[in-house]
Structures are given as C-alpha cells and as structure tokens.
Amino acid sequence: LAPVYSLMRRALDMLVIYDYLFAKNNGRILDEKAFIEQDRIKAQIDKKQKLATLFGTHFMIKVDHLAEVISFNQFVIKEIISWLGGLPYGNIQTIYSGFGDLDEHINKNVKRYEPNSFAEEYYIQNYSPTGELYDPVLALHTTYDQLLPVSNYEYYEQVTKIKYSSHYYAQQ
C-alpha cells in the first residue's frame, strides 16, 4: 500500500547492489533486454555466502529466497522500462548503508541511474496512494513477505491519518 515508487526503489537498490556484490557491476541486470536466469543469479549468490547473509539481512529476505526475489525484481523493472521508456526512479542521490565496511565501496562504485521524467511523472500521477478512504479497508499481512515488507503497510496507515480517513483502515 506504499507508493509503488518506494517498492520499486527498493527493487532498484536491490538489483544494483546485487550487481556490485555478486555480479560484474556492469549493469547488465538492468540495461540489457535479456534476462539473467534465476539459476545463474543463485549460483553467483551461492559463491559468496557471507555476503548473501549480509544482503539478505539488509533487505529482510531469507537467503533461500534471494535469487527468486532478484529475478522477480529484474523482470518487473525491465517491464516498466519497456512500457514507460525508462525508470520512474533513480539512485543518483541514494546513499547506501547497512553493509558495514562495504558501504563506502558500494557508494563509490555502484552503477547509478537517472529517472526518466515521463516515467517518473506517470508513476506519481497513477501509482501514488492518496490515503482517502470512503469504505473500510482491511490490510492482511504476515511478518515476512519477501516482496512487501511490513513497513509498506505502516506508510499507508500514516497517509490515512493525514487524510482523516484512518477510521476506515485496519491492519492484521
């Protein structure tokens, strides 16, 4: 229920950091039309188990699910690029942290992307939750979902409070 923008930013961050830590940091995971197969992603992750654990902890994803989530995010982002002609978000201003001694190296060397202005505006206009509720909404979630972190729902709760419609919103 958070803006799709924030979920896709998380996906972009995950892909560029994966590319830096496990692949060749060449942008292929985003820049090429061909998909990197999930088995190949898993093989690259399996070669660096300590990094995989750090990566999984940072993104709140179990190590066993990393390849699947990275593959899925790659698919979604490449589809968005093909539909809208570019990324609706970028990482030019992103400062990465949470990787300990690697933070400086990641920030210095990770591949950076500019947002496409048309795609960015399209997402703002069409995929941003308003928080304006006129009927009851029940958000059901678990404490672990590899694609949608619990914080996703916390965002929407705040937006409904701002719009004075939180009495229509409940989480479980």
Which residues does each predicted region cover?
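Functionally engaged cysteine thiol sites
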Residues: L1-A2, Q172
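Catalytic histidine neighborhood in serine/cysteine hydrolases
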Residues: D135, K161-Q172
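Short beta-strand/loop motif that positions the catalytic acidic residue
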Residues: L138-H141
